[in-house]
């Protein structure tokens, strides 16, 4: 079953039953009412028993009537809401099943929980299409008379009237669209309406019955001293966990830069666990760190393929001679995208696996009941051992469809004498003591970066090392810079310590070294693909046949 995705930008207003719709041609840019229709619609809304979709500002409904029968999933977006539509499909044993294409978009939240009806909303809608002077649709105005029922325990019926204006055509995200919504707000309020306190009809339908539902695991607050270092660490981990939830559906939709951002969130989450080792600890933490490393590896494989493709395409576009015709260029672009598409399919298989869902459950459990070490907050624990653990992201053999993927991030081994025993300090009570403990962990992260910096610089011209080994030292340095950057952000958010300059400096260093690493990976990958018989070089030879000049021109990539 296919889906359709678009951005919904609208404004809602509550009105009394006797309110009169004002002259809609008074809205900015509106010259005519192109058409008016009446629809009778009925929608069933679905969620888990703990309302994890509703609490995340996500609505899922199956609606009949109107011009868009089917399943509608609405997700938060930067401007407005992202709508995903799917056809109704055929019922199974008399019941309609949520399409997999829709369910996959919320799997990171729903996981193994059953989606069940939570409300019914019936709506008699008078819909008017508002057009400009050329007849182009600008917006749709809906006059809705709503009857709703909560299907939750303690639910009751409700009813009301609502005006809704939704931008249409090319107006969402434009200044013209903003002007339409602004003028609509002024016009409707002057006609007796008020901005709706319910952003969705579902909220009105559920009413007070929503408060009786249990909290989902990711909303359970940890029972820790709010002034302790543990509370600061948990707050930082929650932000990263929420980013995983945010980018999961974006990766599934293959939105631009989503793989990269989900990988960053995964690494930052794990980095915090390692940097603040000694404040939190235990086997569950170690399990999560290990699983996050595997997830980052799968995402890294796709990200690396994406980087190589982007760099190659830029080089291809800069080749402005007539040696390569458009057909050949098209073949090369297709070839370069194949590796990323293959890697992305492996990522999706990973996100659909039980192992990934187990990881999400484990993270929620840890944040709800954090394993504070010995009921204390400690000073730095085993920095070198922890730091080196982040340097290889090797996927496990039982990860679905991606067991051969490797992140390609080697690192030098750690001498046993570098490992330090974990220490435990009494639970602090003052802000100064909290800052002292967190700053100690920050200092350890800084010293790890300095050690790697010295190692990279001192060995850059070492004739006993290969170029690959010398470059690895700079890559290790970059990873330490990222750890320090993440730690600086977390400590700055939790204390009065001024870490912004440190954060920005680490970000700049990470960016420069990241460009170096991307170029390095692209260089190695391109060389491998070009020289292989089944790679680009071999396919290019086959396609160009006797065009030796063209082949020679391409080979410099």
Residue ranges, per PLM feature:
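Cationic, histidine-enriched alpha-helical/coil surfaces that engage anionic ligands
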Residues: 1-557
